[in-house]
Amino acid sequence: VKRARVVVVGSYNQDHVWSTDALPAPGATRSGRYGGGPGGKGFNQAVAAARAGAGTVFLCALGDDATAMQARALAAAEGIDLRDEVHAD
């Protein structure tokens, strides 16, 4: 059986999420929680294709910052090929 090959053109995004138990009243301050993680529709599709067993190439633009390094590490861990990424810095 031949392995399917998939090419995804899209973006890698870093999701940032802040949450609190209730909205603050005008002038009030509330504490909250911060969380985040990898995302972007293109990256999520590439992960899904790779996990389904397809040979997956993800075409995207990445820079040199910590988010880009995280994207490269996550893609490598998922078996996603980034060799044709566009360097954007």
What kind of feature is each model-predicted range?
Residues 74-89:
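A glycine-rich helix N-cap at a beta->alpha junction
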Residues 1-59, 66-70, 76:
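Glycine-rich phosphate/adenosyl-contacting loop at the front of the ribokinase-like
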